[in-house]
Amino acid sequence: MFRTTKRYFCTSFNRRKNVVVIGGGHAGVEAAAAASRLGAKTTLLTKSFDNIGQMSCNPAFGGIGKGTLMREIDALGGVVSGVCDESAIQFHMLNRSNGPAVWSPRAQMDRSVFKKNMQKTISTYRKNLQVREGAAVSINVLTEDDGKQVCDSIVLEDGTAIPASCIVITTGTFLGGQINVGLTQLAAGRYGERPSLPLSKCLSNLGFKMGRLKTGTPPRLSSPINISKMTEQTGDEIPETFSFLNLERDFSPALPQRSCYRTYTTELTHEIVRKNLAFAPHMLAGDILSPRYCPSLEAKVTRFPHKARHLIWLEPEGLDPNSWWYPNGLSNSMPEEIQHNIIRSIPGLENCNIVRPAYGVMYDYVIPTQLKATLETKKIQGLYLAGQINGTTGYEEAAAQGILAGLNAGLSALGREPVDIPRNTALLGVMVDDLITKGVKEPYRVFTSRSEYRLTTRADNADLRLTPLAQSIGLLDDQTHWESFQRTKSLLDFSNKIAKEFILSPQQWSKLGMPIPNDGKYRSAWDLLSFTNLDLFCVISCIPKLKDIPKRVLQRLIIEGKYTYYIKRQGTQNKQLNCRDESTVIPSDFDFDTLHSVSAEELMLLKTIRPATIGQLKRIQGIKPGTIIRLLRHTYYNPAKEAWLRKVYMPMYDMHSSEENQSTNL
């Protein structure tokens, strides 16, 4: 009894209101900043302050799906979006030829400026955030009287222990990292930087199921480069920023803008790769998977032998005339001398120099089905994971996880209730739900196509979806962000109201140049926004009361009006699909052993993942519809519900059983 009480006063008091974030990458920075903004005393532990803001791979943020994450991070008060806007040397909105639901902002960075701006931003968090240099080697965990495991402290290389009730691990590719250049293997998490080997062993010893993934980065090039042999791509004249605060302002880029250039590999390139595959063991490690949507050059050549060429984007890494170039699409792990031959076989790069060779990197990760929706581990209270340690790839995915893990660590340290973000609220919620219910077999990359709610979780409306939440929990660091949001929302609400009140007959609309059916039906301007044959800005320009509304607000109004019908249809479809599953909670202490006629494989999945809702249960790969019915019976039962369940799920179950029988017969 005395030891328990003594332990409480010696450790629990010191750990209270204390968050330690391990790793100063994109996930770590967002986690530390989020916890700090909430008011929790936070320590950001990094091997070197000079490496905060380091962009390990490509010099760009955003892209398809990723741009939406960047807007969501900003809507939650994150730091990276604003830093990107101030460090960008090209802004480009992707997917303009498609619908607004998949428009994706992207921006090219000046590496050195981004790094400087990020370090400057973190330095402003002086009230609650301390940046400390050091390397964590282990985590001390206490087992309380009820058997629950809780975080106690982290231990540094020099033996120093830092008390912490909440720990966020964001180690990126450093966890058990090994880089490969040809047959040369080095223990490293990034070129020239030591990996975190003891921490990986510690997590394994704590009982976490671990896996191993791989990725790679292309060589860095320097002049002379012959851009006359390439196709130039300029940025947008009017930049679409990541930060909503900058969208509201008359934003002008802080830096001069630069172009990117397009070139291609050749048959000679592919022949060089094929002849030297034996010297790329990184590629040959088939049991360790690399990103499907960012394949290495070796993977592209072997997977698509019929293709005569592959696209290469040459991206500037900065404004300095001596800045390096990043050949996006040339990731590989060939020996350096082979890389020189590859580069010389590509139009425009025949005479350039390799200043840093391409390399592959293998690293450990924690199987993410061991996490809650808050990114807290199920095994240890107060331990959170974010970024590549969860099996994802990409700056944006890491930063988004970082802000979620950091805010929940901060809330926990302050004794407040946790926050999770559901699938229907944000693309961040889709990513986290995919990770914790499905797990990963290859590095996970966000796409809008992964979301069944992509019409409502767009890049343009991330503030409407998430900023009120951020304000309610104290995640916005000052009132500027909130006041900007309120102004925008007020203008949107006003514009929406006026558009719905502006009602004319077909003849009146025709006189204004709007060819609509002459059916005698009066229609509002809002109704006309769903017409595909009209210039929607011309429709809005017909409304006198909206003449002074900023174009950016009118653009958002048009998007909402354009998608109204489709959003309603999406809602109906998802309601039918989900069958109220997201709100049907499975008790956290439910004993899955009480379920009958459940396979051993399913039982193992249920015990490992412990789904929180029926919605999560349905998304677990390997769970049969019949098992869903049985679990719903145990969750709550009434005869009417039983009949409904059989009507909805049994056709699926019968089809599933039929397919199984067919495969058995084969």
UniProtKB/Swiss-Prot annotation:
Family affiliation: Belongs to the MnmG family.
Gene Ontology biological process terms from the UniProt entry: mitochondrial translation; mitochondrial tRNA wobble uridine modification; tRNA methylation
Cofactor (UniProt): FAD
The protein's role, per its UniProt record: Component of the MSS1-MTO1 complex that catalyzes the 5-carboxymethylaminomethyluridine (cmnm(5)U) modification at the 34th wobble position (U34) of mitochondrial tRNAs.
MF (Gene Ontology): flavin adenine dinucleotide binding
Gene label: mto1
GO CC list: mitochondrial matrix; mitochondrion
Pfam families: GIDA, GIDA_C_1st, SAM_GIDA_C
Organism of derivation: Schizosaccharomyces pombe (strain 972 / ATCC 24843)
Cellular compartment(s): Mitochondrion
Transit peptide stretch: 1-16
Protein known as: Protein MTO1 homolog, mitochondrial
Keywords tagged on the record: FAD, Flavoprotein, Mitochondrion, Transit peptide, tRNA processing
Binding site for FAD: G23, G24, G25, H26, A27, G28
